Amino acid sequence: IEGGNSIGNRRVIGVYGNIEYIPLPDRPATGYDTYSAYWLPDAQVAVMGRNERAGYQVWSAADGYPGDGVYREFHRKDAKSGMHYWRITSPKTDLGDKMLYDPVLALNKVNENSDHYTTLIYHMLNDYKKATGKEGLVMVSFDTELFGHWWFEGVEFIKQVIKKFNTYLPEVERMTAGEYVHSHPPKEAIQIPESSWGQGGHFY
């Protein structure tokens, strides 16, 4: 939607760096942003761009929340029970040297991360409104297996984020994509480029 190259050079993404992403060539800047929804020009289909900053914060093992050393290590299991008793410790720590998992430390970190995330979203929307005079949209979408599977504490994180928005930042509305389009119908139509998911098709 914005143009350019949102991924950068070839790099590994995903909660545990298990997905290689090969970016497409750079495209000229479009003048559009991901703070709005848009119609496609040839169909009554609305599109929203995932906010890179907000999404990367939750998805990235390298720079986001899931890679924190106190969170439970996914790859090391006890040989007999199959249970996970260890924490990530650090990205470079060998599996055999992982420290034992402490659920209290992990829960404290979830509280810290959810505080940071709700504040981040609030300031992103507030800064956008100050700059443009318009209400903005921050769209985030994730594979559901991220929460509770790859990132064991992810379910609690989502729970706390929703609770904190409801309690402390009720002015930040949470809604589904369909609810947003219904209450804020797009005003512009854009042509989106083909990607590996839409190539040769019509995106709907």
What is each PLM-predicted segment?
Residues N9-I22:
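His/Asp/Glu-enriched short active-site or ligand-binding loop at hydrolase and phosphoryl-transfer sites
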Residues R27-Y204:
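Active-site and substrate-binding clefts of carbohydrate-active enzymes
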